[in-house]
């Protein structure tokens, strides 16, 4: 009797436990380079608020940068790094001209058997070279993408970040946006409800979120692809498309 009860309780717990939010990280060494120079970018597929686990990430389908000079393919600059035995990637890129640099990645589809779907998170982040405050709203032209309405560089902690969720260049009404902080180990969530913040875009696809703590914040607008893909078992399964953008919040320091 006790054994059957224990098994039943475990089944209920597993059924009601919230699914961990996957986030494609694309994190630069700095969001603003006051004197320009080299930026290092780390690409990891993980659960940022919970500091893992790290998922296997194959070499991306696309990786590049958009500047005022146009679009540049950086796929050849990626170097594989292993974390907990899983593939992650790192690239270095020199910014010699002033203005915004919009880095982006299209990962290869990730099969998530626990959710019965593929995941493709189109991710971008902006680095401001020479602190010009320009070029931050350049669009990459990804299948799903966040159009920032707030400059995503030089942002103070507590500032409101606003954006528009786009699919095929058109706003997505009432899109669901998941938000997570890149945990540096200093915060433990009271329970699972605090791990991933969830907000809804309005009828025009616009969302807003005030970042309460310094560090990197990931915004993941999730929509379902129009077409399905074949699972490893040969079944037609849905594809989750994520429009991700990373924004860094910085505390106001005292004047020295």
Regions found by a protein language model. Name each.
Residues 1-9:
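Bacterial N-terminal signal peptides that target proteins for export
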Residues 16-21:
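Sec/Tat signal peptide C-region and signal peptidase I cleavage site
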Residues 22-40, 116-175, 181-185, 235-256:
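Beta-strand-rich domain onsets/edges
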Residues 48-50, 108-115, 225-232:
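Short acidic/polar inter-strand loop motif in beta-rich domains
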Residues 53-62, 170-177:
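Short flexible loop/turn segments that cap and initiate beta-strands
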Residues 64-113:
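Mid-chain, structured segments of secreted extracytoplasmic proteins
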Residues 90-93, 204-210:
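Short, surface-exposed beta-strand/beta-hairpin micro-motifs centered on an aromatic residue
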Residues 186-204:
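Short, acidic Ser/Thr/Gly-rich low-complexity loop/linker segments typical of extracellular
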């Amino acid at each position: 009797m006790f054994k059957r009860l224990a098994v039943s309780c475990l089944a209920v717990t597993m059924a009601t436990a919230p699914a961990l939010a996957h986030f494609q990280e694309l994190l630069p060494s700095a969001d603003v380079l006051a004197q320009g120079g080299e930026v290092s970018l780390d690409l990891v597929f993980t659960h940022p608020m919970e500091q893992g686990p790290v998922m296997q990430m194959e070499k991306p389908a696309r990786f590049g940068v958009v500047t005022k000079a146009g679009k540049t393919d950086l796929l050849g600059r990626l170097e594989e790094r292993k974390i907990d035995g899983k593939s992650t990637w790192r690239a270095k890129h020199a910014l010699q001209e002033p203005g915004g640099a919009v880095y982006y990645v299209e990962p290869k589809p990730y099969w998530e058997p626990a959710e019965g779907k593929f995941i493709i998170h189109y991710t971008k982040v902006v680095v401001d070279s020479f602190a010009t405050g320009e070029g931050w709203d350049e669009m990459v032209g990804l299948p799903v993408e966040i159009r920032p309405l707030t400059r995503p560089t030089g942002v103070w902690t507590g500032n409101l970040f606003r954006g528009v969720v786009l699919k095929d260049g058109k706003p997505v009404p009432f899109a669901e946006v998941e938000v997570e902080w890149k945990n540096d180990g200093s915060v433990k969530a009271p329970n699972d409800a605090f791990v991933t913040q969830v907000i809804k875009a309005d009828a025009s696809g616009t969302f807003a979120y005030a970042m309460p703590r310094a560090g990197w914040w990931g915004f993941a607008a999730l929509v379902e692809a129009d077409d399905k893909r074949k699972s490893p078992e040969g079944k037609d399964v849905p594809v989750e498309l994520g429009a991700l953008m990373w924004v860094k919040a910085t505390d106001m320091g005292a004047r020295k």
